[in-house]
Amino acid sequence: MKKKNFNKDTNKTPSFTGKDIYLYGKHPVSLALENKNRIVKEVLLLSSAQDKINIPKNIPFKFVSKEQLEAHVSKDAVHQGIIARCAPLPQLDTIDIIEESNKKEKDLVVILDQVTDPHNIGAIMRSAAAFNASAVIIPQNGAPDETGVLAKSASGALELIPLVKVKNLSRAMDELKEAGFWCIGLDGYAKRSIYETTLPKKAVIVMGSEGDGLRRLTSEKCDDTVKLPMNPKVESLNVSNACAVTLYEWNRQHLSGK
């Protein structure tokens, strides 16, 4: 079977879901235009924004009024005068991630259990891309659609690493473990701090919801659980912040100086 690369052309027939989406803002749109797996159908611009972005010659664009532009986004969207009408990205699965990981000695994947807020998922995508994760995996049930809000929160990271939606999170964890990954759950009640733990070279960082944390069955599926040591006066961190700290620590242990 031909191995696939998310950021390069592949022989995989794209599986697109849903209708067109509208990405907005200079950085998300610029990265979408650079992503060979993203079909950008049209770019809409305010005349004042024409010098902010380079549009390839093969991509149609047109100047529109502010009212026409903002008809495609929410009222509070920070669009910077730039919107791209796109097809959703092709859907990948756990096997695609494993095939790419087989080429690597070290790898990092994030699994989110019952994290459904698009702003949190977007922020986690941004941290995952910054700290060299290969993918973010979420359950299909209850997952937010790919939207401009999610893309803007991710600051373009949707174009850099895949957001994989799976029907069965437990099965996805089993598949990753069979492929040589260790699943490490972040749990405020864990006995050991992350700083007392040698994280595996191939790690799946499993994050639970901000309110309830890891579900019991998800925690039991993990090979180990760790906690972030914190000031006892602070009950918890936002899930995206906690994830960023954890991903940074894996990078410090395995990629420091590289």
Predicted regions and their residues:
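N-terminal positively charged helical leader segments and presequences
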Residues: 1-103
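Short acidic-hydrophobic, aromatic-tinged amphipathic segments that line or gate anion-handling sites
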Residues: 23, 62-66, 162-170, 226
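RNA substrate-binding interface of SAM-dependent RNA methyltransferases
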Residues: 45, 99-192
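Active-site helix-initiating loop/hinge in glycosyltransferases
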Residues: 25, 113, 120, 236-238
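Structured adenosyl-cofactor binding patch, chiefly the S-adenosyl-L-methionine
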Residues: 30, 35, 129-130, 151-155, ...
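Short, hinge-like loop/turn segments at secondary-structure boundaries
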Residues: 79-82, 152-157, 200-204
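Active-site/ligand-binding-proximal alpha/beta "capping" segment
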Residues: 184-238
